[in-house]
Curated annotation (Swiss-Prot):
The gene is rpsZ. One of its GO terms (cellular component) is cytoplasm. Belongs to the universal ribosomal protein uS14 family. Zinc-binding uS14 subfamily. It comes from Clostridium beijerinckii (strain ATCC 51743 / NCIMB 8052). Binds 16S rRNA, required for the assembly of 30S particles and may also be responsible for determining the conformation of the 16S rRNA at the A site. This is Small ribosomal subunit protein uS14. InterPro entries: Ribosomal_uS14, Ribosomal_uS14_bact, Ribosomal_uS14_sf. Binds 1 zinc ion per subunit. GO terms for molecular function: rRNA binding; structural constituent of ribosome; zinc ion binding. Part of the 30S ribosomal subunit. Contacts proteins S3 and S10. It holds the Pfam family Ribosomal_S14.
Amino acid sequence: MARKAIIEKWSKTPKYKTRAYTRCRICGRPHAVLKKYGVCRICFRELAYKGEIPGCRKASW
């Protein structure tokens, strides 16, 4: 419940630009968000494994 309220609050335009911060578009997680994709590292990993992010491959060396 609290996370839903925070996501609703986050979706509004802040009074000052410095108050804005990145959140995951899927789960609302505030940490480890990849700006290019707009999702957190956990959701990014899941989407990459499903093949939903074009051009993304698992690295192995």
